[in-house]
Amino acid sequence: MITLHFDKLFNNDRLLEPCFVSLPFAKGTLTDASSISLLQDNQALPIQTKITSTYEDGSIRYLFVRFMADLPANRATDITCVLQPESVKHTLPLSYTETVDGFTVSNGELTFEVENHSLHLFRTLDAFGKHYDKECFIGPYLTNSRQISFQMSFDHWTIAEAGDICIVLSCKGQLLCENTSSLPCEVRLTVYAGKSWVDTSVRLINATKDTLEISSYGFSIQEKEKDSVHSCVASSNYKTDFLTSDNGETVEKEITAQMLMNQGNEHFAEVFYGTFFADCTTRQCGVCGTIYQAFQNYPKAVRASSSGIELFLVPEGDTPVIMQSGMAREQRFQLYFHPSEEPLSEISNRSTIYQMPDRPVLSSKVYEAAGVMPDIFVHEKDFNTECALIQCGDSHARSYGMMNWGDTPDMNYTAQGRGNGHLIWTNNEYDFPHACMLMFAKSGIRRFLDYCLVTANHQIDVDVCHYSEDLLLLGGQWEHTQGHTVGGKIVCSHQWVEGILDCYHSTGDERYYETAIGIGDNILRLLDTPTYQKEGSFSARETGWALRSLTALYTETHDAKWLAKSDWIVNQFKDWANTYGGWLAPYMDNTVIRVPFMISVAVGSLMRYYREFPRKDIRTMILNAVDDMIENCLMDNGLFYYKELPSLNRLGNNPLILEALAIAYELSGNKKYLQAGFKTYAKTIENMAHSGGGTKHTLEDTVLTGSTGTKQFAQGFLPVATYYKALEKAGL
């Protein structure tokens, strides 16, 4: 039995509210997704399942579950998952029919058609007795900085997901222009049984060699019924501010950098900042368009009038949004169709829930029992360590802006001059999404899941190369660099897939899975290049990080293609240690040196491989590497140095060493490995506890709050949590 806990959230009942959760299971526990039920007050809820990961024996590792539950006003509630099928009393209206050139969908509140090779999002849509024809739906449309206009062509619709409560339609299309190359675009429509809204996502890809400067980008619904139109736009910062007109006059709102600079907001912005919508209501029906996380993805604007609603993903007249070659970016908006008598308070309520949906939380014991994550689940908790981890995760900077949201600049890299005077973006170095997912599982704090979802969404869009004629770039993740990709490199040591796979399990969105596979394929191509053929000619983290990603992909897919290079890397580490007496790496022309944190990356990755394929020689290699590090890199003050040169052996502060020490203890049972990390652990906890700070300011194309990037938590969480657990096991 698994308990899904919902915290108290809104002050109104949400009946049959659509929700979703990712359920982990231990090997052999569940073999058939139809064998589970979700119970609320002993009544089975409507559910829809998708297996996102299995074990090698075919049993289910992760199960993505959509469900509809009655969530009460002003109080928490629990739902129970049981491993037995129960009959559901609710009969929900949801169906789709494939037509000659598209699909027809009906859910009891809405009926709509989509068609292939169309210039309109819907062919028809009917809601509350009102009929919209295709000419009502304009866009998405785009104008670049050269005033060249693009119009969306919806080329081919497919069903990405379908079940009793939810249908997800996906369309491959392109933004067309007669005078220049088209821009690939993906559109998704998510609809739920009995609900009168459509969650719409538009993902634009710059599959050209040139930089795309977006001057305007939007979508609109035109209103043909001009009489008795009520128009409204609204934004919220704590309370919602409405601009309305009872006779359909134009009302509009815009979000700019200056507005954000002048506005105070204390929310964790990945969870919620405010809502932002436009509504047009006639005598027959109304439609409200809400832009998801509009403040975070500024610039944005909305407009409503007797002519309909307009959603500006990039408003005309603002500074153009820059998309470098190979970038993608998804933006979402909800189209909520409602009766004409719907009160404005309920329209605002549904818009706000879209921004901050109810999310269930599982006990850490569920993840621990399933064994799907590293053993980081401490039972005798240390107050200072727990607070330091939360503080470090919460205090990361937030970078507002359509292309920046979900990433942060690294101010240390920037200060070093790596960007030639421009910001260096972290590009989710060290896998911040994965650290957040682990923290969510360990702590049960909902916002860490939101951190994971926001940053992984940025990672698969902006930080990954979606277009290039160079196969060594295509599908790979960019190293931290200026403008996210400008002048950047793609190398083995700066590509991560575990957080992306976490998001696949958490959302059921196969695009995360596809991106992870693409990164893995890129790593395989890189490993075939001359750079990686000679052991000791590069740092241990290069193939160390590669091994971590390849092992994760094997665990996820059981595809043997990931093992050939994994075995090759393991053997290369053996030859490397035999040749140099350790994993020494070149630094200057005439030196090879020890770098403790890079050696620790290799240790951590080898241990992941070892857990899949236990071998005595790997155990010996890991222990020898950690012994060598303690003998040569541990200073008299109890800390490890940064790098093995007189010019670089300053006090090291990299927590990755703690993971290597904890692994050595796990393999040997010898407490000396943990004792060698006492000072590093204390220093790391002190640094984490005092992380954060900084003012809000505008830099380049972002409004930045705080100064601590995501790297500190990404780099530190798993090593600290692993060492912390080892201390508990050792009784230290």
Feature names for model-found ranges:
Residues 7-32, 213-224:
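Surface-exposed beta-strand/loop patches in extracellular or lumenal glycoproteins
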Residues 33, 39-63, 304-310:
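Solvent-exposed beta-strand/loop surfaces of large extracellular or lumenal domains
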Residues 90-121, 233-243, 336-453, 458-466, ...:
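An acidic-aromatic substrate-binding cleft motif
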Residues 101-359, 406-409, 424-427, 458, ...:
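Beta-strand/loop-rich accessory regions of lumenal/periplasmic or secreted enzymes
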Residues 203-207, 335-336, 376, 431-447, ...:
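Well-ordered alpha-helical scaffold segments within catalytic/enzyme domains
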Residues 317-322, 416-429, 479-494, 527-544, ...:
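Solvent-exposed loop and edge beta-strand segments that line ligand/cofactor-binding
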Residues 342-385, 568, 590, 599-635, ...:
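Terminal, non-catalytic domain-edge segments
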Residues 387-406, 451-467, 510-531, 563-585, ...:
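Long, well-ordered core segments of solenoidal/helical folds
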